[in-house]
């Protein structure tokens, strides 16, 4: 399995283990139709591999070592009322951030992990609240095995 795939798997594993302050009920790498979620499936998150920037670190006659900065896009949904939807979105963002920051090496596969962007639906999906978190992971790999 590639390093990038191992990192994606680590993100799923870490988020799947979260039980506090909120427990994520549905975590997947495949997009889903939020209208088809049951009440019991909230909060729900899907993770997608995003853009990646690569650069050569070292080159020998037989090997090229590259550094990559890969973005992983986490799209999450909560369900609430008109008095708590913003709080639920913020709880989901905070839960994702604190969980991923506990091990910034992604189980030893990465040099560092950063949350580089957070955005919300700003109430347009009510009574569902949506968030988008961009996680940037820097890692090193041997060319041909990203």
At which residue positions do the language-model features occur?
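Charged, amphipathic alpha-helical segments and their flanking helix caps
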Residues: 1-42, 46-146
């Amino acid at each position: 399995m590639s390093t990038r795939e191992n990192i994606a798997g680590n993100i799923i594993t870490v988020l799947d283990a979260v039980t506090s302050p909120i427990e994520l009920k549905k975590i997947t790498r495949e997009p889903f139709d939020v209208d088809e979620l049951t009440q019991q499936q909230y909060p729900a998150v899907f993770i997608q591999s995003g853009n990646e920037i690569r650069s050569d670190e070292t080159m020998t006659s037989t090997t090229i070592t590259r550094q990559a900065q890969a973005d992983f896009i986490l799209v999450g949904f909560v369900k609430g009322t008109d008095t708590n939807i913003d709080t639920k979105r913020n709880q989901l963002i905070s839960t994702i951030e604190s969980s991923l920051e506990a091990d910034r090496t992604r189980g030893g596969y990465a040099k560092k992990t950063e949350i580089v962007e957070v955005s919300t639906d700003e109430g347009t999906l009510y009574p569902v609240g949506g968030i988008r978190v961009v996680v940037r992971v820097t890692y090193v790999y041997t060319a041909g095995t990203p």
